[in-house]
Amino acid sequence: MVIRVYIASSSGSTAIKKKQQDVLCFLEANKIGFEEKDIAANEENRKWMRENVPEDSRPSTGYPLPPQIFNECQYRGDYDAFFEARENNAVYAFLGLTAPPGSKEAEAQANQQA
């Protein structure tokens, strides 16, 4: 399974840049494999992202803004959903991945099942 993070390399918004960097740095630090898909430099990436963000996750006006996160072709969420999952030690579940043994998330899952 490949995590795909749709970003905009040439965004003029500092907020978007910070959010993108936050997601990418977290994935790198936790050795979670991912692909960056640049919507600013590649029209196909932009089109695919816009078409595959579910209706209920789209803004009321305009297009969904990066970063948008997918596991293969399955939509996982935007930055706000990622941030909430990280705060709740549930990023692996958010991404649709199995938490590694010994992680806080794996321990929390084990405690819930007990």
Curated annotation (Swiss-Prot):
Residues 13-50 are annotated as: Required for interaction with HER2. Its main location: cytoplasm. Residues 54-71 are annotated as: Required for interaction with PFN1, HER2, and ATG12. The SH3-binding domain is buried in the tertiary structure, and it therefore unclear whether it directly mediates protein-binding. It holds the Pfam family SH3BGR. Monomer. Interacts with PFN1/Profilin-1. Interacts with ERBB2. Interacts with ATG12. Interacts with BECN1. Interacts with translating ribosomes. Keywords: Cell membrane, Cytoplasm, Membrane, SH3-binding. Appears to function as an adapter protein that bridges proteins together or proteins with mRNAs. May function as a ubiquitin ligase-substrate adapter. Additionally, associates with translating cytoplasmic ribosomes and may promote the expression of specific mRNAs. This is Adapter Sh3bgrl. One of its GO terms (biological process) is proteasome-mediated ubiquitin-dependent protein catabolic process. GO terms for cellular component: cytosol; plasma membrane. InterPro entries: Glut_rich_SH3-bd, SH3BGR, Thioredoxin-like_sf. The keyword Membrane applies. The keyword RNA-binding does not apply. Transmembrane segments: none annotated. A motif (SH3-binding) lies at residues 61-67. Gene3D superfamilies: Glutaredoxin. One of its GO terms (molecular function) is ubiquitin-like ligase-substrate adaptor activity. Belongs to the SH3BGR family.
